[in-house]
């Protein structure tokens, strides 16, 4: 039975690292899975600089619907994305079978201190200048 693991959290908290470890563990158990990384998919979609709420919802819905399409074919999906938007969390819970939401959190000062990509020096950052809507459960 396929599942959708939605790995979410602010930029730089370790979502991709966690998702890669999860994928490796699933592979060891012979569970076929695919990893959808938000940064990689955003680049493919040419949405690198689109951070208005409407654009973030649009991109996150693409991730959600892609996860649904793949999981409906019996493949476990791991989505690593910021997507801290209640509307997306709600849609996922209502529309994705076997949906597991994983929130990765770290103290903001620790994130900024370890910010190798200098993301937190930019003007538009979810959780800093853009409101983050953390999952409720």
Describe each region flagged by the PLM:
Residues 2:
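Short coil/loop residues immediately preceding or within conserved phosphate-binding loops
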Residues 5-7:
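Hydrophobic anchor at the beta1->P-loop junction of P-loop NTPases
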Residues 12:
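Walker A (P-loop) phosphate-binding loop of P-loop NTPases
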Residues 15:
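Conserved lysine of the Walker
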Residues 19-65:
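Conserved substrate/cofactor phosphate-moiety recognition/catalytic segment
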Residues 40-42, 83-86, 105-110:
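Conserved nucleotide-binding/hydrolysis micro-motifs of P-loop NTPases
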Residues 44, 52-100, 119-124:
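Glycine-rich phosphate-binding loop used to anchor ATP phosphates in small-molecule kinases
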Residues 105-108, 112-137:
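Small-molecule kinase domains that catalyze NTP-dependent phosphoryl transfer to phosphate-bearing small molecules
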């Amino acid at each position: 039975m396929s599942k959708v693991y939605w790995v979410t959290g602010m930029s730089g908290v370790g979502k991709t690292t966690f998702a890669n470890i999860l994928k490796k563990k699933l592979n060891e158990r012979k569970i076929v899975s695919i990893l959808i990384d938000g940064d990689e998919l955003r680049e493919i979609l040419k949405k690198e600089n689109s951070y208005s709420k409407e654009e973030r919802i649009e991109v996150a819905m693409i991730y959600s619907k892609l996860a649904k399409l793949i999981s409906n074919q019996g493949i476990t999906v791991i989505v690593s994305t910021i997507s801290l938007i209640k509307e997306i969390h709600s849609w996922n819970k209502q529309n994705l079978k076997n949906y597991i939401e994983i929130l990765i959190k770290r103290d903001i000062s620790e994130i900024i201190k370890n910010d190798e990509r200098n993301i937190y020096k930019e003007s538009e950052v979810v959780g800093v200048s853009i409101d983050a809507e953390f999952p409720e459960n």
